[in-house]
A protein has these predicted regions:
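N-terminal membrane-targeting hydrophobic helices
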Residues: 1-141
Length: 141
């Protein structure tokens, strides 16, 4: 099974190709940036390996305590290594943590209109693509 750096190199090489193609096709730079930020977060922070003592979890320092329930719930290389499901679960998990943090800080939940812009969708797609590439590399090796 490839290590943390092998996953990062593979993911970023693929993203460089995606970015070059997108730039060549005159994709909006802001949209490419949204995809790239999601891809970065999906590669370096919300990896399928958050359920092990991986480099990704160690990089979080004391914040890794937030992922203990995730680690206890998911067995490594099972549902967390599903191409779409794993990324969606991690996105929902971190969203719940952010919502609780917001509530603790402001004593209320966010109000106002919930919106889905193209940038949010591209950000989430970036996370899902990074997750899919991680799983693909694990399957190959």
């Amino acid at each position: 099974m490839p290590g943390y750096n092998a996953h990062r190199i593979f993911n970023y090489a693929i993203f460089a190709a995606i970015a070059a193609l997108a730039w060549h096709e005159s994709v909006n730079p802001k949209q490419l940036l949204a995809l790239g930020i999601g891809f970065y977060i999906g590669t370096d922070f919300l990896t399928p390996d958050l359920d092990t003592e991986s480099t990704a979890i160690k990089r979080l320092g004391r914040l890794k305590i937030l992922f203990l329930p995730y680690k206890w719930t998911f067995t490594h290389r099972q549902s967390s290594h599903n191409i779409v499901y794993g990324a969606v679960v991690r996105i929902l998990y971190i969203s719940i943590i952010m919502l609780v943090l917001y509530y603790v800080l402001f004593k209320s939940f966010p109000s106002g209109t919930v919106f889905f812009s193209a940038y949010i969708i591209l950000f989430l797609v970036g996370i899902i693509i990074a997750n899919a590439l991680h799983v693909l590399l694990d399957v190959i090796f």
